[in-house]
Amino acid sequence: TLIKKTAKGEVDAMKKSDVVLWFEELRREDIPLAGGKCANLGELFGQVGVPVPNGFAVSAKAYQMFLKKTKAEKKIEALIADIDMEDLESLQKASQKIRNLVEGLPMPKDMGNAILSSYGLLCKKVGKKPVAVAVRSSATAEDLPGASFAGQQDTFLNVFERSLLKRVKQCWSSLFTPRAIFYRKEKGFSHSEVLISVAVQEMVFSETSGVMFTIDPVSGDTGKIIINASWGLGEAVVSGQVTPDEYLVDKATLRILDKRVFKKDQQIVSDKKGSTKWVTVPKSKQNKSAVSDATIVRLAKYGVQIENHYGVAQDIEWAVDK
């Protein structure tokens, strides 16, 4: 057991110093290293047996190293110290200056190489060159009770190698939106203790996507699963810009209890320029259910698996690829 302990200690020490951590290496207790999003993607990828697109985290340590190596830390602290928190304009100006600073600094060479070579390895693992990826912020404090940082950091879809490092820096700089700066000040967080990781994940070009709740969010009924679905990429549902179809499933029997299908005339799709756009849904699909009964049951089954693993109700973003 002693040898095992040493080996685990070495692995943990390596984990702590790595710029890149693959999902398969991550577990939910790794939130300090990789943020809530990446740690839980790692847990789902390696432990739960549900299909999760592969990817890696640019670690919180990498962000810390970036600030140190580029000497940005002191400049950021000085800019924050000068803010008059009562004055919105002062807050907005400082936020813009900090974001421009972080995004404008060159990525240290060894760090950039580590991220780009991991992207190359992801292409190999997925068996596609090039692979479009989603680049998403994963804040180390976003899932702390009473400190909801969710929605205050950025997500970039349909990213390729040429803009990957730029998008990583934009995720880092999104820690300094006016709202996030103000929020941390209000809650008494030091800006230097809130680190950010970035998820780089194979992008699923979804025909249909949505959100699933393993408990009825309105009534609180723990025996029901609610699934929302719409055409195209999931941002449309998450942002609340379309009215998705809604399916009600009995958790114990996986029987579909109710289906409410709405007109869905707009969807988000990826475009050739490496971003996304809104398009009109073909007329033949606008009033059609976005998922089949078999898919509804399969999703509900995954929902039960995930809830059982975590021991608490979950809300889960999902996608069905083309």
Describe the predicted segments one by one.
Residues 141, 206, 233-235:
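Short loop/turn segments at secondary-structure transitions that flank enzyme active sites
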Residues 2-4, 9-199, 208, 279, ...:
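N-terminal beta-alpha lobe that positions the nucleotide/phosphoryl donor
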Residues 224-315, 320-321:
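Conserved catalytic alpha/beta cores of large enzymes that bind or transform nucleotide phosphates
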